[in-house]
């Protein structure tokens, strides 16, 4: 490995960490503003009704989910719809960390008191924008720029690994 390759790898890792941190910040804000939709079915309903307000689509799957043919078909359809409607897409490679981020806020809410039901479907998460203020949010702007740069490099659905805390 040459010095240039080592330096480029380090920069890429640092950049991915920054993008992961920005994603955490966007999710935290979306939870507090209630501008988040969780679940494949719920996401499909929202995309059908109001695609113009969706600013980010997250698809989360681990290695076990990669063998789920039905889920992969859903992902393909959602990706196609998002590309057609200029919605940025990110693939999250560690859905466990995504669950931690999304369920920390909801544990104290009514969902936790319903008893031991099935865990929520976190395979698809949509972030909507209630106002035209998306460009004022630096974390969301960073994610949008990252998605745009990835598309320029023919990586239409970039994979993000959320940093463990």
UniProtKB/Swiss-Prot annotation:
Q: Which Gene3D superfamilies match?
A: 3.30.1330.30
Q: From which domain of life does this come?
A: Eukaryota
For the keyword Nucleus, the answer is yes
One cellular component term from this protein's GO annotations in UniProt: nucleus
The cellular location(s) given in this protein's UniProt record come to: Nucleus
Q: Give yes or no: UniProt keyword Ribonucleoprotein.
A: no
Q: Name one GO molecular function term.
A: kinase binding
- GO BP annotations, alphabetical order: cellular response to ionizing radiation; cellular response to mechanical stimulus; negative regulation of blood vessel endothelial cell migration; negative regulation of transcription by RNA polymerase II; positive regulation of apoptotic process; positive regulation of JNK cascade; positive regulation of p38MAPK cascade; positive regulation of reactive oxygen species metabolic process
Pfam families xrefs: Ribosomal_L7Ae
Instruction: Write down which residues bear the modification named Phosphothreonine.
Output: 2
Keywords recorded for this protein, A-Z: Cell cycle, DNA damage, Growth arrest, Nucleus, Phosphoprotein
Q: Which family does it belong to?
A: Belongs to the GADD45 family.
Free-text function comment from the UniProt entry: Might affect PCNA interaction with some CDK (cell division protein kinase) complexes; stimulates DNA excision repair in vitro and inhibits entry of cells into S phase. In T-cells, functions as a regulator of p38 MAPKs by inhibiting p88 phosphorylation and activity.
User: Assembly and partners?
Assistant: Interacts with AURKA, PCNA, GADD45GIP1 and MAPK14.
- Per its record, how is this protein called by name? Growth arrest and DNA damage-inducible protein GADD45 alpha
Q: What is the lineage of its organism?
A: Eukaryota, Metazoa, Chordata, Craniata, Vertebrata
Gene of origin? GADD45A
């Amino acid at each position: 490995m040459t010095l240039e390759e080592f330096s480029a790898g380090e920069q890429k890792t640092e950049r991915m960490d920054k993008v992961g941190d920005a994603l955490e910040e966007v999710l935290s804000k979306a939870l507090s503003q209630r501008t988040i939709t969780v679940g494949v079915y719920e996401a499909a309903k929202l995309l059908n009704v109001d695609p113009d307000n969706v600013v980010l689509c997250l698809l989360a799957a681990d290695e076990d989910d990669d063998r789920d043919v039905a889920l992969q078909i859903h992902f393909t359809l959602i990706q196609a719809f998002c590309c057609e409607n200029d919605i940025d897409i990110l693939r999250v490679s560690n859905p466990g960390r995504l669950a931690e981020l999304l369920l920390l806020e909801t544990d104290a809410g009514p969902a936790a008191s319903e008893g031991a039901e099935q865990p929520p479907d976190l395979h698809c998460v949509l972030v909507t924008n209630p106002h035209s203020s998306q460009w004022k949010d630096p974390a969301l702007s960073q994610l949008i720029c990252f998605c745009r740069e990835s598309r320029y490099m023919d990586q239409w659905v970039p994979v993000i690994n959320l940093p463990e805390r």
